[in-house]
Amino acid sequence: MNRTWLVIDSHNLCHRAWHSLPKLSWKGRPTEVIFGFLNSVDVLRRHFVTDDIVFCFEDSRSSFRKKLFADYKSKRHTPNPDPVEVQSREMLYQQIVGLRERHLPKAGFKNVLQYRGMESDDIMAVISRSLAYTKDDVILVTSDSDLYQCLAPNVMIYSLHDKKLKTEKWFKETHGIPPSRWAFVKAVGGCHTDCVPGIPGVGETTALKYARKELPKTTKAYQSIVAGKQIILRNRALVELPGGNCPIPELVPHRWPDQGWRKMLQSLGARTRMRA
């Protein structure tokens, strides 16, 4: 039986709920991230008509990338946060841990994944690599463009930014290179969101021109790229997916846990039940 695997960047989805929803609580415990996350999952599984959902959570606190490059993701947190921000982030963390360790497994979901030192996109990438060119379809749910490098005939990306499905064909037509070259482009142009500096004076647009062999050799940018091999090598280790030694999970096919889903929502004080 051919399956459609919905592989969710769960850390990303939790952060989106945290930024977009008002504060909610039940019996003194914060719940806005949990409810925003679960509502999105419910919408996604109905949209793609599949019960085979994989939740990928990251363990960035011990990321191997920080050991390779100390400034990796260094600007994502305020150096001296005020007490309100500290409390808000702690509430976010509590809800992420609650989803990963308690709510989702207890509801009956079998594929709830986290590996030491690995980010969500590492796990998503290793899953997509293991299932690429099989008869199953893989839909990566994320807003992280780094995962474009994983696109294949049966591996697609559903963007949380514009709610559109990105395919291998779309990528080739839009960028003029195969997905396998995307990590090189990111290594040359840098990744602002992850604080990975590229070749000085070279951005993504110029890096794409170089990758397509459209950048004249006489330009300063071309010469900078050629001279910046060490920067590119360092960055490849940071942006290439999957990174490190991410384990290949054994995914478990299963049906949507109707009863567990209802019980989970009731235990969280849901006034209106999301459909099971």
Predicted features, each with a name:
Residues 140:
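Conserved SAM-binding loop
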Residues 165-175:
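Short, charged, surface-exposed secondary-structure boundary motifs
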Residues 261-276:
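Long, highly charged low-complexity segments enriched in Glu/Asp and Lys/Arg with interspersed Ser/Thr
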Residues 121-130, 176-186:
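Short, motif-level signal for alpha-helix interfacial/capping segments enriched in acidic residues
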Residues 2-137, 147-165, 233-234, 240-256:
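Noncatalytic, basic helical substrate-engagement surface that gates or grips nucleic-acid strands
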Residues 178-250, 270-274:
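Accessory alpha-helical DNA-binding modules that contact the DNA backbone or grooves
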Residues 130, 153, 212-213, 267:
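Residues within well-ordered alpha-helical secondary structure of globular protein domains
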